[in-house]
Design a protein with these regions (language model features):
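N-terminal core-binding DNA-recognition domain of tyrosine recombinases/integrases
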Residues: 27-37, 47-135, 151-154
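Basic, Lys/Arg- and aromatic-enriched nucleic-acid-binding interface segment
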Residues: 124-178, 182
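Catalytic-site neighborhood detector that most strongly recognizes the C-terminal catalytic loop/helix
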Residues: 139, 198-202, 308-333
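Active-site/catalytic core of tyrosine-dependent DNA strand-transfer enzymes
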Residues: 145, 210-278
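Short, basic (Lys/Arg/His-rich) helix/loop patches that form interaction surfaces
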Residues: 155-158, 256, 265-306
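Conserved tyrosine-mediated DNA breakage-rejoining catalytic core shared by Y-recombinases
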Residues: 183-222, 235-236
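Short, polar N-cap/turn motifs at the start of nucleic acid-interacting alpha helices
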Residues: 187-193, 277-280, 299-318
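DNA/chromatin major-groove-contacting recognition/catalytic segments
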Residues: 208-211, 321-345
Length: 345
């Protein structure tokens, strides 16, 4: 009988893996599978729970982490103490961030259950926040989107022109995410269409290029003949690597994208202050605006879902959920008017 079998027979407790080392293995696998976005969120989830436990290097045995009580303590800590990325912001993470980190932990837990590391508890995450929803309007009104679309780019400061152009192209390309715009290649343009694979899901998308986008593409296209990318969003770092005789790794390219995204969002804030005071602009707004305006124009949720490249209509519904209350309120007003005016008929 082996020592391991003898220990099990005698009832000796099996040593549980540490969450940090286990999650790091998961992150490395995601990196190997080129799932950069997932690896990025898992990395921040690990940093967050490590901070909750007292910092990197502190022991986090998984049988202690994955208990209803400890998960609830972690959730309450995130609501109260979890630091945001921008130090000027108050402590406490948003519900969306809390949900993301909890869902990351839930996925890790299910992986451990599948590997027989931990027993299955179907109610383990019942008391913590794991919802995927949006109660916040990220979409612009029709008039606001029209303001941006009709803006004379020549009147903007030079560093903001291409940023607004990219935002408009994202809207015109059926709410294309910024990451997909950044990774578009010159070869993806097939006549009057763009054929590309979504970075997040790998799903192939075909988008007809509207005439409103033609001029923007012509003016703001990548003019570097050595670059494979359609727009000069990742070109600076790419060129440096080529001059050094090195091939850029996917992970490095993704980090370039994250830097570009941060700069993009900061400049969108400046554009909002100039053109739409009191309105918050971010990379998400173009996508949500397209979905919302399409919804209000009478397009079915099924068509909107397909246009956005969602695998499930449920994902699309989270985009449109903030407007459900508006429809209910409007219907309620019509009902009240109908009842109040009954005797006048």
């Amino acid at each position: 009988m082996s020592k391991k079998e003898k220990n099990v027979e005698m009832g000796s407790p099996m040593k549980m893996p540490d969450l940090a080392s286990y999650m790091q293995t998961v992150i490395e696998q995601l990196e190997a599978d080129k799932k950069r976005s997932a690896a990025h969120t898992y990395t921040y989830a690990l940093k967050s729970i490590a901070e909750f436990y007292g910092g990197a290097g502190m022991p986090m045995p998984v049988d202690e982490v994955f208990t209803p009580g400890r998960l609830k303590e972690y959730e309450e800590w995130m609501r109260r103490e979890g630091m945001r990325k921008r130090k000027r912001e108050p402590k406490g993470l948003s519900l969306n961030t809390i949900s993301t980190y909890m869902r990351n932990l839930k996925a890790v837990y299910h992986r451990m259950v599948g590997e027989k590391v931990l027993p299955y508890n179907p109610k383990l995450f019942d008391d913590v926040y794991t919802k995927v929803e949006s109660q916040t309007k990220r979409a612009l009104e029709l008039e606001q989107m029209n303001t941006l679309l009709c803006t004379d780019l020549r009147k903007l400061p030079s560093d903001l022109r291409c940023v607004l152009a990219y935002f408009l192209l994202m809207f015109l390309f059926r709410g294309m995410p910024f990451i997909d715009l950044a990774y578009l290649r010159k070869q993806d343009v097939k006549g009057n269409r763009i054929v590309y694979s979504r970075h997040k899901t790998g799903r192939q998308m075909t988008v007809r290029i509207p005439k409103e986008a033609m001029e923007l593409m012509k003016e703001f296209k990548n003019r570097n003949p050595d670059s494979i990318y359609l727009f000069p969003i990742l070109h600076k770092q790419e060129s440096k690597k080529k001059r050094a005789g090195k091939v850029k790794k996917d992970k490095e390219l993704y980090m370039d994208y994250l830097r570009a995204l941060r700069g993009f969002n900061l400049k969108l804030e400046k554009i909002a202050s100039l053109l739409l005071p009191a309105v918050k602009l971010s990379s998400y707004v173009a996508r949500h605006t397209w979905a919302t305006l399409a919804f209000h124009a009478g397009m079915s949720i099924g068509i909107i879902s397909k246009a956005l490249g969602h695998f499930s209509i449920k994902v699309t519904e989270t985009y449109l959920k903030p407007f459900e209350n508006e429809k209910v309120d409007a219907a309620n007003e019509e009902l009240i008017i109908s009842v109040a005016g009954y005797n006048e008929k």
